[in-house]
Every structure is written in C-alpha cells, then in structure tokens.
Amino acid sequence: MIQAILVFNNHGKPRLVRFYQRFPEEIQQQIVRETFHLVLKRDDNICNFLEGGSLIGGSDYKLIYRHYATLYFVFCVDSSESELGILDLIQVFVETLDKCFENVCELDLIFHMDKVHYILQEVVMGGMVLETNMNEIVAQIEAQNRLEKSEGGLSAAPARAVSAVKNINLPEIPRNINIGDLNIKVPNLSQFV
C-alpha cells in the first residue's frame, strides 16, 4: 500500500504532499524534511529505491523516487508494493501531468494545485492504485474540464446572477426586500446590464 506521495523541488520546498495514513502535522513535516535529505544526497546514477523504515514507523517501508528536472517525485510504500511497479506509476503520473499541462513544470504544480490533486486521485486513492492507463486518466480529466466549462465555474456566478434577475421580468427592480425582521437593500443592478 502507498503510505504517502511527496513532490518537492531541489530546495526541499514541498509542491505536493499526500498522506494515506494519519500522522500529526509535525510528524508529516519531519517526514518530508527527512525524505528530502535522504533523496537529495543520493547520486543520480544510484538505485531509486531506499529503505525508509525509521521515517514512517516500520521497518518494511521503502522510498521509491524519480528526479525530473527540478522536482523529486517520492512514493513511500510498504513491502507489499513492487518497486518497479511504483517507478512505472510515477512515470504514468508525470506523463499524465505532462499531457494535461502541456509540458508540466513546477509552476503548474503551484498554480493548479486543485487539478494536480484531481489527477492524482484518478491514479491513486486511499493508498491504492486505481488506474494506470494514461489515456483513460486523461479522458476523465477532459470530461471533468468539460463539466466545469458547462457549469461556467465560479467566475461566471455574478453574470448568472444578473441574468437571473433580468429574466424575472419584474416591471421595476425592487430597492429593498423585507422578509420578516430582515431588510435587504438591493444594489443598483443597472450598472451590470
């Protein structure tokens, strides 16, 4: 089972942190720091697996990582997971990010955190691998994007509110709405029309 997924840059700044086991925040920060120091001091031509038993609390935990440009992608897993399978999973996750963001970079992980988390949830949920087919993952992401566009998102909410008021066909827009003891002053909507 996957215990945690960590993505941090060359300077140790976390860009994505997802724990699938409950830890206090101080312990999570310590795990991220120690993982960064363990991974950073390894040479690029050394094996991408290392023991992480003392980090997460058991002797059967491993850290499996890949280094892409300025980012380290680290999966903390227990002994039941295949190291090569997790390396392939990291590759699938990164290539999916690359397809969704058209040449993904660190800034995409910073400014599109919600989308990155959604992509990760399509791949891994609750520490279990859900999907490894990149085309299927991208199709789900595109379906989600179409749904968001059809709903208009939050940015279109003010325009929808104004058009809803216009569609009421009131002869005159009320200036005050009284509901019991509650008195609501209606703003001048003519400036939005």
Swiss-Prot record:
One of its GO terms (cellular component) is cytoplasmic vesicle membrane. It is found in: Golgi apparatus; Cytoplasmic vesicle membrane. Present in all adult tissues examined. It is a peripheral membrane protein. It comes from Homo sapiens. Belongs to the adaptor complexes small subunit family. Adaptor protein complex 3 (AP-3) is a heterotetramer composed of two large adaptins (delta-type subunit AP3D1 and beta-type subunit AP3B1 or AP3B2), a medium adaptin (mu-type subunit AP3M1 or AP3M2) and a small adaptin (sigma-type subunit APS1 or AP3S2). Interacts with AGAP1. AP-3 associates with the BLOC-1 complex. Keywords: Cytoplasmic vesicle, Golgi apparatus, Membrane, Protein transport, Transport. It holds the Pfam family Clat_adaptor_s. Gene3D superfamilies: 3.30.450.60. The keyword Electron transport does not apply. InterPro entries: AP_complex_ssu, AP_mu_sigma_su, APS3, Clathrin_sm-chain_CS, Longin-like_dom_sf. Part of the AP-3 complex, an adaptor-related complex which is not clathrin-associated. The complex is associated with the Golgi region as well as more peripheral structures. It facilitates the budding of vesicles from the Golgi membrane and may be directly involved in trafficking to lysosomes. In concert with the BLOC-1 complex, AP-3 is required to target cargos into vesicles assembled at cell bodies for delivery into neurites and nerve terminals. Disulfide bonds: none annotated. This is AP-3 complex subunit sigma-2. Transmembrane segments: none annotated. One of its GO terms (biological process) is vesicle-mediated transport.
